[in-house]
Amino acid sequence: MEELDGEPTVTLIPGVNSKKNQMYFDWGPGEMLVCETSFNKKEKSEMVPSCPFIYIIRKDVDVYSQILRKLFNESHGIFLGLQRIDEELTGKSRKSQLVRVSKNYRSVIRACMEEMHQVAIAAKDPANGRQFSSQVSILSAMELIWNLCEILFIEVAPAGPLLLHLLDWVRLHVCEVDSLSADVLGSENPSKHDSFWNLVTILVLQGRLDEARQMLSKEADASPASAGICRIMGDLMRTMPILSPGNTQTLTELELKWQHWHEECERYLQDSTFATSPHLESLLKIMLGDEAALLEQKELLSNWYHFLVTRLLYSNPTVKPIDLHYYAQSSLDLFLGGESSPEPLDNILLAAFEFDIHQVIKECSIALSNWWFVAHLTDLLDHCKLLQSHNLYFGSNMREFLLLEYASGLFAHPSLWQLGVDYFDYCPELGRVSLELHIERIPLNTEQKALKVLRICEQRQMTEQVRSICKILAMKAVRNNRLGSALSWSIRAKDAAFATLVSDRFLRDYCERGCFSDLDLIDNLGPAMMLSDRLTFLGKYREFHRMYGEKRFADAASLLLSLMTSRIAPRSFWMTLLTDALPLLEQKQVIFSAEQTYELMRCLEDLTSRRPVHGESDTEQLQDDDIETTKVEMLRLSLARNLARAIIREGSLEGS
Amino acid sequence: MEEIYAKFVSQKISKTRWRPLPPGSLQTAETFATGSWDNEENYISLWSIGDFGNLDSDGGFEGDHQLLCDIRHHGDVMDLQFFDQERIVAASSTGCVTVFLHHPNNQTLSVNQQWTTAHYHTGPGSPSYSSAPCTGVVCNNPEIVTVGEDGRINLFRADHKEAVRTIDNADSSTLHAVTFLRTPEILTVNSIGQLKIWDFRQQGNEPSQILSLTGDRVPLHCVDRHPNQQHVVATGGQDGMLSIWDVRQGTMPVSLLKAHEAEMWEVHFHPSNPEHLFTCSEDGSLWHWDASTDVPEKSSLFHQGRSSTFLSHSISNQANVHQSVISSWLSTDPAKDRIEITSLLPSRSLSVNTLDVLGPCLVCGTDAEAIYVTRHLFS
């Protein structure tokens, strides 16, 4: 068995007592059923009152969040767009496409986060508010991880630009500074504000040196005594060499300049230029990349990855991607200082800095309460061709496995199932069978919904499912006595057996009531009539009635006869057909020719001779038999009379 | 058609309708109603696209539509119509027809009137009672006509508790949509490709006229009548075809136009500019059909980067007698008769279930739980 990656969490179900009674459970696709049984653990005979409920336990609870639904729906569109990115695209254009997709995903997460934040603030119930707030922090962590993965795996920034990206990353996620800055600048005397130096320090820590310089100039204006050293500090900040995107200088040039600048800073420290201002001196130490000075600002750094990026900015701005993991690990250790152990988020980020994609995905799968994140991130990374080597020992590859999990979760939801379909489509190995299994289990409460499900199946040539859905609908219609509808559905499913069954119901109704229902349908069957013999008979029989109604007796007569001679009519119906022939036989003019009359007689004899002999006969049976015998007698008489007339007529016609 | 606003609303939208403007008003549309389907809880919601202050750089109003109020609706919302300025009639998958009243003072909706068992398979009162979804509703104050999967047609009158007229078994298959032709005539479409015209003056359960697609019996899902020429009717079918009918003559469509790749869920003539027609489909597309004749100069303006197709009527079986007065939808002259089609939604994914147009404004709702609104249809 596979080793466990962590202790599974225990979920307590309120009201269920697993100590006293044995539990029963059953797995569903995304859910589990749990209930108490009346079996006792210790075989005591006393009956412990058990919990009367059956519980449904859902694994993927996030699917049920109203706000996250927007995330699922909006990202579905992005996912489809990503699948359609031309495989032919290579190099730069492909990379920029993938980065754009990644940014789209992130902006959807952010939009969700903002809305969730608004709701959390507006929540009246504190427990509710807490729940939303925790969702906000989960979303924020997802965006943080995604952004880092985007920089490291998709953008694949080289030394130099890498640090710029990381700085942006930190600035985006440690954003308290903006409100602080507004607060300080809004005050009457900014440089006397309690948080003035905190603000300046944060700006320096985030490498926002231009803004820090502006703040320093305010301090210089306010206290002329320190104006000189403030200006020196400002110059140091201004001259710090940085790589700007439009710049053409090489890394070596930059490194050289940077070294030069670093030495200059060093000199100021040794000269104790800033000794009079402890604030400025600590800023200088930060700019020298002094670890102790940085760690003093733990509060302002707020987390180890901020520490990491600041440390790199001021000690090794041209860090290479492969060296990142060394700095990351040591930054984490230094920052935590053995006081606390790393949390799941720390481990995930660390794994990313180590370029261990699989570890990132694995840790995320364990830590996050939904499959959305890992499924979409893995899919995106797979499109970057980063995951091809990895195969699971079950199912197919990891991308597909995660997409299947996510899509199954969607299918468990009463209305998000439509999204799941497209995800299954892009799982080449097991997507189709999964879809087949799920799609049949969607409850069909209206025909409109059924049509949507049918369309999904028909587009994918899932004939078996199409037939089964049509059959369900046809059955429903029969149960509701909607024979026309039932027939339409069985025609659509090309289900001959069911069409026969429905046609029999029509014929039976006709025999009982003496008239047809649903003429609008039967008269317009067209080629669909050929589906089953019985349906053909129904259609033709109705045609006979129409001809008769239109007084086209000769046509009607030959159609009636052909129904019997071609054996399309079920034998049980022959008597009715022969009875229908009676009025034709009794018409003034001769309609059935001698030939046809012989045929009719043969049919009648065929029918009567094969009649089962009733052994025991009760009164009702006898009465029925009586009527039957009368009918046969009448038919024989009519047939004989018609034959006589026909022979005379044909003889005289030939003679004339 | 520069800006089209999308908003994700966490519910699959089955119907959207603009609130009608008061007669003689010069305002543009600003309130619309939506109904949801296939959710655990379904809602009727009212939205406003009115200005919320923010003028953007181009001087137009920025921002998407805002929720005014909503109310629970039992079952899927199958159809939705404004009865008047304040009242909305909703058809439910439970067979119930409900009139909701909007109170603009405190922005709430309440149930005004309800016919709970308007559509059913086995009658109310019987132990095996089973309801049937009500699939379509149409209003013409004070009358409300509903149709359902049970093939039944009901005529209700606001403020009457019982149906004024019921035609049981009006259709052997499911009725999908209904529209008024000219009072007191209605027109229904069904799932075997037939249009039936019913005259409420006649007693009995027979339609006064049946028109049908030949052969394939393709189900028809939607119908709309030309706002000025009451004999011109457009229908949309399961195969995505648009059919134009002249109910005065013939029993077959005047023209069949190849359109969407899947079910056409709704078709609407523009109410004040009927040379324009709008359709939406299960395949996730929303199309604008322009049959006004000045195509060449317009085309340069209209389809920048959008997929545009010209087509001419594929099938025509009508001998035209009075060409001059006839609507361009019925004309059969191939030289004049060109229709420009513009696709209005950028990328297609899940079904566009519904659309409505009023003045320069268009709203549509999708299964991807988004509502799209544009206020500049003809810019």
Swiss-Prot record, chain A:
List of residues that carry N-acetylmethionine: M1
Modified residues (N6-acetyllysine): K92
GO CC terms of this entry: actin cytoskeleton; ciliary basal body; cytosol; intracellular membrane-bounded organelle; kinetochore; membrane; nuclear envelope; nuclear membrane
BP GO annotations: lamellipodium assembly; macrophage chemotaxis; mRNA export from nucleus; nephron development; nucleocytoplasmic transport; positive regulation of DNA-templated transcription; protein import into nucleus
InterPro entries per the UniProt record, alphabetical: Nucleoporin_Nup85 (IPR011502)
Subcellular location: Nucleus, Nuclear pore complex; Chromosome, Centromere, Kinetochore; Cytoplasm, Cytoskeleton, Spindle; Cytoplasm
Phenotype when changing A477V: In NPHS17; uncertain significance
Positions of post-translational Phosphoserine modification: S223
Tagged with keyword RNA-binding: no
Transmembrane segments: none
Keywords: Acetylation, Centromere, Chromosome, Cytoplasm, Cytoskeleton, Disease variant, Kinetochore, Membrane, mRNA transport, Nuclear pore complex, Nucleus, Phosphoprotein, Protein transport, Translocation, Transport
GO-annotated molecular function: structural constituent of nuclear pore
Main location: nucleus
Protein family membership: Belongs to the nucleoporin Nup85 family.
Annotated disease: Nephrotic syndrome 17: A form of nephrotic syndrome, a renal disease clinically characterized by severe proteinuria, resulting in complications such as hypoalbuminemia, hyperlipidemia and edema. Kidney biopsies show non-specific histologic changes such as focal segmental glomerulosclerosis and diffuse mesangial proliferation. Some affected individuals have an inherited steroid-resistant form that progresses to end-stage renal failure. NPHS17 is an autosomal recessive, steroid-resistant progressive form with onset in the first decade of life.
Function of the molecule: Essential component of the nuclear pore complex (NPC) that seems to be required for NPC assembly and maintenance. As part of the NPC Nup107-160 subcomplex plays a role in RNA export and in tethering NUP96/Nup98 and NUP153 to the nucleus. The Nup107-160 complex seems to be required for spindle assembly during mitosis. NUP85 is required for membrane clustering of CCL2-activated CCR2. Seems to be involved in CCR2-mediated chemotaxis of monocytes and may link activated CCR2 to the phosphatidyl-inositol 3-kinase-Rac-lammellipodium protrusion cascade. Involved in nephrogenesis.
Record text on subunit structure and interactions: Component of the nuclear pore complex (NPC). Component of the NPC Nup107-160 subcomplex, consisting of at least NUP107, NUP98/Nup96, NUP160, NUP133, NUP85, NUP37, NUP43 and SEC13. Interacts with NUP160, NUP133 and SEC13. Interacts with NUP37, NUP107 and NUP43. Interacts with CCR2.
PANTHER family reported for this sequence: FROUNT PROTEIN-RELATED, NUCLEAR PORE COMPLEX PROTEIN NUP85
UniProt-recorded name of the protein: Nuclear pore complex protein Nup85
Gene name per UniProt: NUP85
